[in-house]
Amino acid sequence: MLKPLGGRVALKIEEKGPTVGGFVLAGSAQEKTQTAQVVATGQGVCTLNGDLVAPSVKTGDRVLVEAHAGFDVKDGDEKYIIVGEANILAIIEE
């Protein structure tokens, strides 16, 4: 299993659809974003004074992420993307 480092997050992209959490996305928003599930997070990032800031997302969260963000990776037969937490636009609460 992948374990991202720092402020990175491993995501499993969901099949594209016209809605996110029941909200219909405008055509331009569908092209710029995608829905994904968080499969792993890094430990977070350190501030200038050395404090560790944990990620805002956790394993299992559904998120809205920028469509072209991150790097494609494979772990066995599974495909994932690894993105910086800043590329995650929102947590989808249901």
Swiss-Prot record:
This is Co-chaperonin GroES. It is found in: Cytoplasm. One of its GO terms (cellular component) is cytoplasm. Together with the chaperonin GroEL, plays an essential role in assisting protein folding. The GroEL-GroES system forms a nano-cage that allows encapsulation of the non-native substrate proteins and provides a physical environment optimized to promote and accelerate protein folding. GroES binds to the apical surface of the GroEL ring, thereby capping the opening of the GroEL channel. PANTHER family: 10 KDA HEAT SHOCK PROTEIN (PTHR10772), CO-CHAPERONIN GROES (PTHR10772:SF58). It holds the Pfam family Cpn10. NCBIfam families: PRK00364.1-4. It comes from Streptococcus pneumoniae (strain CGSP14).
